Amino acid sequence: MNSNVENLPPHIIRRVYKEVSTLTSDPPEGIKIIPNEEDITDVQVNIEGPEGTPYAGGMFRMKLILGKDFPAAPPKGYFLTKIFHPNVSNNGEICVNVLKKDWKAELGIRHVLLTIKCLLIHPNPESALNEEAGRLLLENYEEYASRARLMTDIHAQGTSLRGKDPTDPCSSASTPVVSGDGPMAKKHAGDRDKKLAAKKKTDKKRALRRL
């Protein structure tokens, strides 16, 4: 892989190195940086699939490539782990506004990573690179979620990450993971109700035995 380090001015290299070092020691919730000491323009990370989404329980490897025009031009983002998502093409390319028209030179790598993680919670079918995933998201959410879970189970099994980031715009403290009336929400609510009912039944039997 060709490195862009020699194409970047020294002050940009120092900026990137500092931010990657900070992200490595203090990563956002559900994100782990994998430093590349030989090429800091190749930023690879593991992103934990957010709870309440079809990607929950998965660990997704992705990378940002910082081009020679960075930070005037946005980095390019790719998922290395196969994923069924409207905004990720078959070759892993990520389509999100912050990597295109909404990019600003002052935006950092942390902001980009949090935006990509947020995309797992709130897909945007209007800018779909995977047309089938975008169509299913709009027309048949249950089928979309089933396909996404299957891909997650096959390709994205990994170890859970720990730690919370108060700056994460998609954290449970600031943004609900799914709407209360969505198919996933109903499923989880039903599972919880069944478990509570079973527990109450068991507790009642134990109480009767003591009488």
Curated annotation (Swiss-Prot):
Residues 158-211 are annotated as: Disordered. Pathway: Protein modification; protein ubiquitination. Residues 197-211 have a biased composition (Basic residues). The gene is ube2s-b. Keywords: ATP-binding, Cell cycle, Cell division, Nucleotide-binding, Transferase, Ubl conjugation pathway. The active site is at 95 (glycyl thioester intermediate). The lineage of its organism: Eukaryota, Metazoa, Chordata, Craniata, Vertebrata. One of its GO terms (molecular function) is ATP binding. This is Ubiquitin-conjugating enzyme E2 S-B. It comes from the Eukaryota. Residues 11-157 form the UBC core domain. GO terms for cellular component: anaphase-promoting complex. It catalyses: S-ubiquitinyl-[E1 ubiquitin-activating enzyme]-L-cysteine + [E2 ubiquitin-conjugating enzyme]-L-cysteine = [E1 ubiquitin-activating enzyme]-L-cysteine + S-ubiquitinyl-[E2 ubiquitin-conjugating enzyme]-L-cysteine. InterPro entries: Ub_conjugating_enzyme (IPR050113), UBQ-conjugat_E2_core (IPR000608), UBQ-conjugating_AS (IPR023313), UBQ-conjugating_enzyme/RWD (IPR016135). GO terms for biological process: anaphase-promoting complex-dependent catabolic process; cell division; exit from mitosis; free ubiquitin chain polymerization; positive regulation of ubiquitin protein ligase activity; protein K11-linked ubiquitination. It holds the Pfam family UQ_con. Its EC number is 2.3.2.23.
